[in-house]
A protein has these predicted regions:
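A generic alpha-to-beta junction signature in SAM-dependent methyltransferases
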Residues: 71-72, 138, 161-163
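A short acidic, Gly/Pro-enriched loop at the edge of an enzyme's catalytic core
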Residues: 133-143
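Rossmann-fold NAD(P)-binding glycine/threonine-rich loop
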Residues: 172-188, 200-206
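C-terminal hydrophobic helical "lid"/dimerization subdomain
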Residues: 156-160, 200-247
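Glycine-rich phosphate/adenylate-binding loop and adjacent beta-alpha elements
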Residues: 1-41
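Short glycine-/small-residue-rich Rossmann-like dinucleotide-binding loops
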Residues: 127, 149-150, 172-173
Length: 247
């Protein structure tokens, strides 16, 4: 980021219009070494394992910031839509932040994973009564909803699961548009907020949770030669947790 615009000067460098993003405007990091701007490089303790820490620097800070954007307070409820590579980390961050968690997904293995990570309630998002169950469990709806899922029904469901004056934070990037149930948004005064990765401050905080052992991504190391196969598996939705490519 430029460090000189109104966004950078107020701590919102992720909104800088002149920022560079690896894999987009500059080369990515499918390499043994990469050049980074020192002021924007995260600091890791010598004791950490790079393979297990790698997802924290992307998925971790993304969901941590997304949870902060819901403005849910300790003791309140958040619903996390999607328990995949992002969502399984989000459950852990939410619990570490003192929040009660309802996890939604469509696979029993994902729901079992959410329960094992501390979710107070894990529900099949396809069930006819899932919204009613969320409303009942949370006493009127979640105070915050984090949407990591990329299916259009997940967004409408997120609005339905939110209580009045809740904030729905969107971190997933699905193709196309998400239809908005505007009647519910207006009537319940729900805030819908996009969130993209996180700032340097967010990154430092996300790393701290992981270093203290409160958050640990499920990582499968794979050799770099498998890169194309891994990408195919990602597109097919066959990856649980995260994969770290090793050289």
């Amino acid at each position: 980021a430029c460090r000189a615009c109104e966004y950078c000067e107020t701590g919102w460098e992720t909104l800088c219009e002149r920022q560079h993003n690896t894999g987009y405007s500059v080369n990515g990091t499918y390499a043994e070494y990469a050049i980074a701007s020192a002021p924007f490089a995260g600091r890791l303790p010598d004791s950490v394992d790079f393979v297990t820490m790698a997802p924290i620097l992307c998925a971790g800070v993304t969901v941590y910031k997304g949870l902060k954007e819901t403005e849910a307070k300790p003791g309140e409820w958040v619903t996390i839509s999607g328990v995949g590579g992002l969502g399984h980390v989000a459950v852990q961050y939410a619990k570490a932040m003192g929040l009660h968690v309802v996890a939604l997904d469509i696979g029993e293995s994902k729901l079992e994973l959410a329960r094992s990570l501390g979710a107070d309630l894990a529900l099949d998002a396809r069930a006819d009564n899932v919204v009613a169950e969320v409303q009942n469990a949370t006493g009127g709806g979640a105070h915050g909803v984090l949407v990591t899922a990329v299916s259009p029904p997940a967004f409408a469901q997120a609005i339905a699961c939110a209580r009045r004056r809740a904030t729905v934070s969107l971190v997933g990037l699905p193709p196309g548009d998400f239809p908005t149930p505007i009647f519910d948004v207006v009537l319940k005064r729900v805030t819908v907020r996009g969130s993209i990765v996180g700032t340097r401050r967010d990154l430092a905080e996300a790393i701290a949770f992981a270093v203290e052992g409160k958050v640990k991504a499920h990582v499968t190391p794979r050799p770099f030669d498998d890169v194309n196969a891994v990408l195919d598996e990602l597109r097919a939705g066959k990856v649980d947790g995260r994969i770290s490519l090793t050289l």
